[in-house]
Amino acid sequence: MHTDDPVLDLMDRFTAALNSHDLDAVAALVTDDIVFESTSPPPDGTRYEGRDAVRRIWAEMLTTTPQARFSVEEQFSAGSGRAVVRWRYDWADGHVRGVDIVRVRNGQLAESLAYVKG
């Protein structure tokens, strides 16, 4: 945990909640008006707005790939409640690497813009 940086600490808790498939914890860590832009379909992904929409997309992903897991390769705070998280997402027969650019507001995730390699 990054107890000296509340933004990185939040991202650690968010990743742990996803990996444990705890959708209640995921929902508690995001703002009511969160904006999440996924990586698919290419080239621009899909934009989801609001806690309920984001919860639904994560529930769908975790249901279709229950063995999947995120690993944080590197993350750093960019100041003003922003951070960059470089990650690897593994599932049964493959993986993808990517980056999320995030914004935190009042201790909750308010925006997550995801990008992948390839």
Stretch-by-stretch model annotation:
Residues M1-G118:
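C-terminal and inter-domain tail/linker signature
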